[in-house]
């Protein structure tokens, strides 16, 4: 993240979920340089295996993100936070979504999580790395530190609005280990290899907004 961002946020939490993938090595470019042409997602997109990245308030640009195209995805749950940006990163297919929309215009309490995840899936995302800029009361966390969390505490009252289950569909997701450990360890090894200040393990507490 940029120094200006770092002065506002105590730590950056990286949330990993789903399957694993080999670590990537970024090089040069940014979503701001993406083509302005809008592409509508097609059935072919679902056949492309992609790494999904959801950027929070501290991540809008990714170095080395090439061949960029903004894509519009229709979902049965309404509109996602923004168009999704597809491209390649170190030779791998990637799809990026700015969680709060370009220009940071959507409050955390207004996010349409179901539409966001559905859109990611429709564009072939098999793994998702979600990045959030957060604060902490623990002194060991410094500005711009990365915390690879391994647990959640959900203190919101709106989880029923964000589930794919209900209305005749019953599902139970185990929450003992909500983060993909294999993917988390790959991210940890990659961060250490790059000599990035990273913390192994942590709990993300999600509070009720708006904030």
Walk through the language-model features, giving the residues of each:
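Intrinsic low-complexity, disordered N-terminal segments enriched in polar/charged/small residues
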Residues: 10-11, 25, 35
């Amino acid at each position: 993240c940029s120094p200006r961002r770092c002065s506002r946020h105590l730590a950056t939490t990286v949330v990993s979920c789903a399957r694993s993938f080999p670590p990537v090595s970024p090089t040069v470019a940014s979503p701001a340089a993406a083509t302005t042409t809008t592409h509508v997602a097609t059935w072919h997109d679902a056949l492309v295996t992609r790494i999904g990245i959801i950027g929070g308030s501290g991540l809008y640009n990714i170095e080395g993100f090439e061949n960029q195209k903004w894509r519009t995805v229709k979902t049965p749950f309404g509109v996602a936070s923004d168009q999704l940006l597809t491209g390649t990163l170190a030779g791998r297919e990637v799809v990026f979504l700015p969680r709060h929309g370009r220009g940071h215009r959507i409050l955390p309490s207004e996010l349409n999580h179901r539409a966001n995840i559905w859109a990611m899936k429709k564009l072939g995302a098999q793994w998702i790395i979600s990045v959030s800029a957060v604060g902490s009361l623990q002194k060991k966390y410094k500005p711009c530190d990365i915390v690879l969390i391994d647990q959640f505490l959900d203190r919101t009252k709106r989880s029923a609005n964000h589930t794919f289950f209900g209305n005749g569909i019953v599902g139970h997701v185990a929450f003992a280990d909500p983060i993909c450990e294999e993917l988390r360890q790959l991210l940890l090894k990659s961060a250490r290899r790059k000599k990035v200040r990273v913390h192994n393990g942590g709990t993300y507490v999600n509070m009720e907004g708006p904030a």
